[in-house]
Each structure stands twice: as C-alpha cells, then as structure tokens.
Amino acid sequence: MTFPRIAFWTILAFLVSIGSTVHADSRLVDGLGRHIDVPEENEHVICSGSGCLRLLTYLQAQDMVVGVDDMETRRTRFDARPYAIAHPEYRKLPIFGEFRGHDNPELILTLNPQPHVIFKTYASSMGYNPGELQAKTGIPVVALNYGDLGQLRSELYRSLRLMGRITGKQDRAEKVIAFFEETITELRRRTKDIPEADRPTVFLGGVAFKGPHGFHSTEPTYPPFQFVNAHNLAHDPD
C-alpha cells in the first residue's frame, strides 16, 4: 500500500470519526454485548452480512441505504430473495464490499453520502470483525444476531427492535413482530386438530444460508412447517 493511499485512508477515517463523535449521544448495547455510541438521528446506513439488508427492508428503511455488498448487484435468472425483488433499486447502489460480511473499509469511506451507522450480522468465522471495521472507518458498527422464527426468535426480535430504534422505525419494528406472532398463532390454531395420519409430508429446497445454495439445501427444523404441524422429510424421512 503506497503512502498517499495510507494518508488518504487515515485522513478520511479521522474526519468521519470526528463527525461521529460530535453527534453520538445515544449509547446502545449491540448483539455482541458491545456498548456503542450512535447518533441520535440517522439518515444514512449500510447493511453488512447475511440477512442484514433483509431485516432493514422489513422495517421499510430502504431509503436510508447508501451502499450494498456485491451480492445485491448480481443478476441471475432467478432471484430467491423477495426483498431484493421488491426493491430492484438496491442493484444501482455503490458497492462497499463482498457478500457474507467481507467489507472494504476504503470503499465505505468513499461512499457519498457517508453512512451514519453500519449494521452488521456477524459470525466470528466469517466477515470483517465489527470492532476492527469501526476502528478503521470511524463509523459506529452495530452487530446483530440474525436469529430465526424458531428457537432463536427472541434474537430476531431484539435485532429488529435495535435497528428500529436506530433508524427511527420503532413502531414498524413492533408491527412486524406482532405480525409474526399473530400469524404463527393462527397457523397453529388452524392445523392443531388435524389427525397425525392426515398431516402432509413436505420438503423444502433451495434454502439460503449465508448466501444462496442449490435445491438440495434444506432445513430439518424449518419453522413454518412446524407451525402447520407438517411432516418435514428432512427431519423425519420415514
């Protein structure tokens, strides 16, 4: 790395950190238990890591996004991500790194406008460390646990509420959570009295895990099948 490039990166990080420090007046605890100072009001954000942009889209905060990872700009014959289909404008945004959380601090610092906060779903074995990313960019990095609608539902809800608080979408976060809970309850109510012998046998293919996979990618404990009391072939092939 040449000296001018190092100087450019250092100066940008310093200037961004000054702006973040001046306006950071709200301290939050993120998904990794880190205490993070974030601006009280945020207009621009980016989402890093698997599923992160999906959660932000649930909150209808898509207009705040100023950059995406390279996954969002890829064109395929079939896109299995409903949020991306609903918002094709993501494809036109600047790229700040590679998918699965492999961010590029230099590209982040060239985004215009600059993000006030970086949301990041994080796994220790994959992607840029949130603390290191924050140190190199001077931008608050809020780590999130993606969770699911099964045993990790509380983590999903906590992440939605945290994102909602930072983006000013608290009411929307609660509406999304209420929708999930009401729908799950209704599905269970409708199917709980179906005799065991009459319950359908089903299989789910093409499950995405930290990115898209083929048809044979499945989930033995797929929560929606559990909600309707269906027999999941991947869980009980007999």
Residue ranges and their predicted role:
Residues L28, H35, Q134-G211, H231-H235:
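Extracytoplasmic substrate-binding proteins
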Residues L32-Q60, A208:
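Conserved H-X4-D acyltransferase segment
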Residues H213-D238:
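Alpha-helical, coiled-coil/dimerization segments enriched in small aliphatic residues
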Residues A7-I18:
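Bacterial N-terminal signal peptides
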Residues S20-A24:
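Sec/Tat signal peptide C-region and signal peptidase I cleavage site
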Residues G51-R54, M71-R74, A123-M126, G147-L152, ...:
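Solvent-exposed loop/turn segments at secondary-structure junctions
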Residues I46-S48, V66-D69, H116-T121, V141-N145, ...:
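Structural recognition of the beta-strand scaffold that forms the well-ordered cores
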Residues G49, L53-N112, H116-A123, A230-L233:
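A short, structured surface patch at a secondary-structure boundary
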